[in-house]
Amino acid sequence: MKKWFPAFLFLSLSGGNDALAGWHNVMFYAFNDYLTTNAGNVKVIDQPQLYIPWNTGSATATYYSCSGPEFASGVYFQEYLAWMVVPKHVYTNEGFNIFLDVQSKYGWSMENENDKDFYFFVNGYEWDTWTNNGARICFYPGNMKQLNNKFNDLVFRVLLPVDLPKGHYNFPVRYIRGIQHHYYDLWQDHYKMPYDQIKQLPATNTLMLSFDNVGGCQPSTQVLNIDHGSIVIDRANGNIASQTLSIYCDVPVSVKISLLRNTPPIYNNNKFSVGLGNGWDSIISLDGVEQSEEILRWYTAGSKTVKIESRLYGEEGKRKPGELSGSMTMVLSFP
């Protein structure tokens, strides 16, 4: 005779992986460097080198996030991530802009390369360091730590604007340099601070780059006003006005002229044009060709000119009388 025993299954479900989730205590310790580099006399075609070293020393906590205990109880793990976050371009107080191009990152992992404004360099070490004690494992901003690990320097090329005026310059390169110290309770439960969070940390390190620009190119003016004047609307379509810009260079160089519209056009006619309002566009030409880019070359010191021409365009039924205005930006750069 068989006897049946009732069987009961109890199942408890929780959202996500909460049952397996561990805790994380994360601190960021920042260095506070002030370095100077004097590149001497340079020309805009030169690309002086910029070294950002990794020096050991005392660092101060500038960030913390602790989801775990303040003091350990039993086994826990540790890991470290060295961070360098360096701007891709730097402005002076006068509004001039230089770009930093990576020349050497040996020993570093360069990550999040699509960021428009910053380079991110990471170096991890002492992964999953096993520890069993009752030490303090959550520290607040202001706590100081001696950091003695050594890493390779970062080397950059400094790209100068082709139209940088002659004179002495000081470019402050402010960057983030520090260590992310991570405590956690589950083996291999690694954590890296998000890039958007890292780049918001205080840039406590400065490298002051100084140099004297002794050669380059200068446009004859910073503003050109192409004025069509007062026109009868029936005769406005196709009206042409122009201005000529002179550029003087005293170094052998190729200069790319690029036009960028500030006011979008009304019509899509596959030409570079600028919107003027009231149903009108301005179709732009450079040296008689409907284009938005041109390259000029200098082999000896001297001036060259570029003619910027505006041709009014408006379609029947859309164009209206009134004041017309629009703008564009001309950029001088190396090809």
UniProtKB/Swiss-Prot annotation:
<feature type="signal peptide">
    <location>
        <begin position="1"/>
        <end position="21"/>
    </location>
</feature>
<dbReference type="GO" id="GO:0009289">
    <property type="term" value="C:pilus"/>
</dbReference>
<dbReference type="InterPro" id="IPR036937">
    <property type="entry name" value="Adhesion_dom_fimbrial_sf"/>
</dbReference>
<dbReference type="GO" id="GO:0007155">
    <property type="term" value="P:cell adhesion"/>
</dbReference>
<dbReference type="Pfam" id="PF03627">
    <property type="entry name" value="PapG_N"/>
</dbReference>
<protein>
    <recommendedName>
        <fullName>Fimbrial adhesin PapGI</fullName>
    </recommendedName>
</protein>
<keyword id="KW-0732">Signal</keyword>
<comment type="similarity">
    <text>Belongs to the adhesin PapG family.</text>
</comment>
<dbReference type="GO" id="GO:0005576">
    <property type="term" value="C:extracellular region"/>
</dbReference>
<keyword id="KW-0281">Fimbrium</keyword>
<dbReference type="InterPro" id="IPR038420">
    <property type="entry name" value="PapG_carbohydrate-bd_sf"/>
</dbReference>
<dbReference type="InterPro" id="IPR005309">
    <property type="entry name" value="PapG_chaper-bd_C"/>
</dbReference>
<dbReference type="InterPro" id="IPR008966">
    <property type="entry name" value="Adhesion_dom_sf"/>
</dbReference>
<comment type="subunit">
    <text>Interacts with chaperone PapD. Assembly of the P pilus requires periplasmic chaperone PapD, in absence of the chaperone overexpression of this subunit is toxic, where the protein accumulates in the periplasm. PapD stimulates release of PapG from an inner membrane-associated form (where at least 1 disulfide bond can form) into the periplasm and also helps it achieve its correct digalactoside-binding conformation.</text>
</comment>
<dbReference type="Pfam" id="PF03628">
    <property type="entry name" value="PapG_C"/>
</dbReference>
<dbReference type="GO" id="GO:0030246">
    <property type="term" value="F:carbohydrate binding"/>
</dbReference>
<keyword id="KW-1015">Disulfide bond</keyword>
<comment type="function">
    <text>Tip adhesin component of type P pili that binds preferentially to host cell glycosphingolipids such as globotriaosylceramide.</text>
</comment>
<keyword id="KW-0964">Secreted</keyword>
<keyword id="KW-0130">Cell adhesion</keyword>
<dbReference type="InterPro" id="IPR005310">
    <property type="entry name" value="PapG_carb-bd_N"/>
</dbReference>
